[in-house]
């Protein structure tokens, strides 16, 4: 049987969105009347069709049932967790790399500098701080558990005392368990829960929120000519299978975040397709996390206008994601991104 996918599009925002929802001309995303839509794109492996929501009633019966089912998921409210407020768009995950070799800030925030930077990110408006002790940049190698833990444990302990919400960026179940005992609120495993076969048991044991991240290959090999039949639909199907996997393994809660993994086993075309069509993933019913900050695709697009921090491209991609209803943005330059969001939202009020 042919499989169809539903992508919401043509969004409206702020006061205009509120008015349109009240007049039943648009549908709210996640029950939030400040962002709504009036068109959907129906996709399959060999076709796509853009229609107004009023045209849904004219679809063939089976397809109409599928679309209506998807829309119920898309318009349903998402419950808050891990200090995220999904009534707001977008939430901010501040990046703290306690590594000597991360792609943009390796070695910059070790020891006391890391703790102080985390406080700065939180005071600037981060909902949560994503702490990592192992680089997963392209061509990076796995490090020993002891080394990874030694890089992060002191900072985790100090942040716990200050009650700063922490996300732990790790692939290793032992690190996860130690972090959870120090108050970690979210597990962010870039391997898609497949690096360590004990990960799923730790997540279940402590009933912790977690991300399902997409990556093709591993950090050392992921950029060696990545290929997909259809990058958008392949990754959507991947998430569906991963949800089945975690349910099969006894995880019943819905405190799950999906991250399509920009730059993790994708070339420029793949990344652009994923970001530009990101609203497809709303039909999975879980918050979407995007990490585009300072990524290489910004350099590939900007070419001779590239800069070390890639701040302009990071802000531009963050605002685009916000306009597509992405619930969480993983960013390095928290203050600047939040400033851009505040200005954007203020302009929407009129």
Kindly give the residue locations of the regions a language model identified.
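Conserved, mostly hydrophobic/aromatic
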Residues: 96, 121, 125, 129, ...
């Amino acid at each position: 049987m042919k499989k169809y996918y539903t992508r919401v599009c043509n969004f409206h925002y702020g006061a205009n969105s509120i008015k349109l929802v009240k007049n039943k001309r648009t549908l709210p995303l996640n029950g939030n009347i400040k962002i709504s839509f009036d068109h959907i794109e129906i996709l399959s492996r060999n076709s796509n069709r853009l229609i107004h929501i009023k045209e849904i009633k004219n679809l063939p019966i089976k397809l109409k049932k599928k679309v209506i089912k998807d829309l119920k998921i898309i318009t349903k409210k998402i419950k808050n967790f891990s200090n995220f407020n999904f009534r707001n768009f977008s939430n901010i995950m501040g990046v703290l790399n306690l590594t000597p070799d991360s792609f943009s800030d390796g070695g910059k925030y070790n020891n006391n500098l890391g703790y102080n930077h985390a406080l700065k990110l939180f005071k600037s408006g981060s909902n949560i701080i994503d702490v990592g002790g192992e680089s997963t940049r392209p061509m990076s190698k796995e490090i020993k558990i002891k080394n990874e833990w030694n890089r992060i444990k002191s900072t985790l302990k100090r942040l716990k005392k200050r009650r700063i919400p922490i996300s732990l960026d790790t692939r290793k179940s032992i690190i996860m368990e130690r972090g959870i005992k120090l108050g970690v609120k979210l597990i962010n495993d870039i391997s898609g829960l497949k690096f360590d076969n004990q990960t799923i048991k730790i997540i279940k044991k402590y009933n912790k929120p977690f991300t399902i991240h997409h990556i093709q290959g591993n950090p050392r090999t992921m950029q060696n000519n990545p290929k997909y039949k259809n990058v958008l639909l392949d990754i959507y199907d991947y998430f569906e299978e991963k949800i089945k996997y975690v349910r099969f393994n006894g995880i019943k809660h819905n405190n799950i975040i999906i991250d399509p993994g920009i730059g993790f086993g994708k070339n420029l075309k793949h990344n652009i397709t994923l970001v530009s069509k990101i609203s497809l993933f709303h039909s999975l019913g879980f918050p979407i996390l995007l990490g585009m900050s300072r990524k290489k695709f910004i350099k590939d697009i900007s070419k001779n206008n590239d800069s070390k921090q890639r701040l302009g491209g990071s802000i531009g991609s963050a605002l685009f994601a916000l306009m597509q209803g992405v619930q969480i943005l993983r960013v390095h330059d928290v203050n600047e991104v939040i400033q851009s969001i505040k200005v954007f939202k203020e302009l929407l009020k009129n």
